[in-house]
Each structure stands twice: as C-alpha cells, then as structure tokens.
C-alpha cells in the first residue's frame, strides 16, 4: 500500500478537477472518484465528505450576477463529490452517509442546472441500489427517514 502522503496526493489529484469550468471534466472526475472511493480506506471518506459539504454550501448569487458561474461550479463540485461518495457505497449506509445525503445533497434538488440534475441522478441511483435492503437501511436515517423518502421520491408537497 502507498504511504499515507501518497494516498492523500492521489485523492488531491482526483479532487482538483471537480470545480473545473467544463462540466464534462467535473463529471468524469466524480466518476473516477466514486471508483477510487469504493476501494479506499474509510478514514479518508469523512474528510472528503466535509470538503464536499463545504463546497456545496457555497452561496449562490442571483443568476447573471458577477461570480454566479464560479459559485455554481463550486456548488456543482461539492454536489458531484458528495454524489461520488454515495455512489462508492451502493449497498451500504455508513455512519456519515445520512448527513451527506440530507444536509449536502437534498437541499440542492431545486438548485440551478446542472446541480439539480446531479442531485436527481444521485437520488434515483440511491433508491435503486437500496430498495432491496431499505427496511434495514432506513434505520440508519433515524427520525429523518421521511426526508430521505422526499429526497429519493421527490417532495410530496410539490404535487399538492
């Protein structure tokens, strides 16, 4: 196994293109990160989830305002990174995942494209990969289980 510094350097290289101005580059970086996340040590996941949550929390100015595009790229980078971590554990709900799903991803379901598109894709994939074990997996979300239902199925108040 590579030394911890080398492992961190690899992760840094994978994270660097997430805020790239080109959407395709961001999406491919997230796909690669999901694959590497699947086989990396779990000790690296929590710091990554914090990094992605901070990026996703970037305030978005109004569309057309100075800095909107750069802020949207940062938010999308955070959402892509968070979605990559969720995708890295398709049949498991680790301790860090409920907060990442509900506090980082779900709030962006109505954000401008391409952020909302990424969130909807992640929600659909999460629902697909967890449907067989949902009776057990939902216990990991505790009192917030309704929020994850809203995330994966769409908010019910939208249809009222």
Model-found features: residue ranges?
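Acidic, Ser/Thr- and Gly/Pro-rich intrinsically disordered linkers and low-complexity segments
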Residues: 53-74, 120-124
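Hydrophobic residues within the alpha-helices of tandem HEAT/HEAT-like
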Residues: 1, 18, 32-40, 56, ...
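Core helices of alpha-solenoid repeat scaffolds
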Residues: 3-12, 42-53, 93-102, 138
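Eukaryotic acidic, Ser/Thr-rich intrinsically disordered low-complexity regions
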Residues: 116-160
